[in-house]
Amino acid sequence: ENMFRKFLLACMVMATFTMQIQAISINELNSSSQFKNVYQKSYPYEGGSIQNKLISYLNTYSVESLEYAAPHYKLKGTFYAVYETPRSASITEYELTATYDTNYSLGSLIQAMNLVKPSASMYAVIKAAQDKSGIQVELQEVKRYNVDGTEVISKVPLEHQLRPLDRGRFDEDLFAVADAMFAVAYQQHFDDIVVK
């Protein structure tokens, strides 16, 4: 019985020291090399000169490969979206699973257009890229925080999406995060890959 108690105590101590810190603050996001600012955008607040701001930070240590079967890849990672308005600021933690088809990277599309028609116009390449980005995402909101790192308890349901990414303005933040995950995993940007 005494040996069992010692075992339980040892397990509790191990669990305490191996648990990841769950809370995240704006200071951590800005100061730790583990978090990379991969997207930032300011836009006017209610038509005035005061700006709202969205900043996305990728936890570079969280990126893991789930599938590697070129030209198809699947990665999973965690990122934090910081929303700043004139009145408040908040942090939202997301888990992003991105499935990549490099047949649709800009490099591959340009290569394919040149094979079909040697002087492919950039318009045709851009049109093809807009029709299909080559990235499908599953986005799961995990937690919400105040900028000091305290968790926000809310009755608002956590967001969940499963959909293809658009290369346009609507998804430019998620595209930047998915591209940064690809660069962390493979040391190359998604659109630089050329499938021959």
What is the predicted function of each stretch?
Residues 1-3:
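Short, Lys/Arg-enriched N-terminal segments with co-localized hydrophobic residues
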Residues 6-19:
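Sec-dependent N-terminal signal peptides
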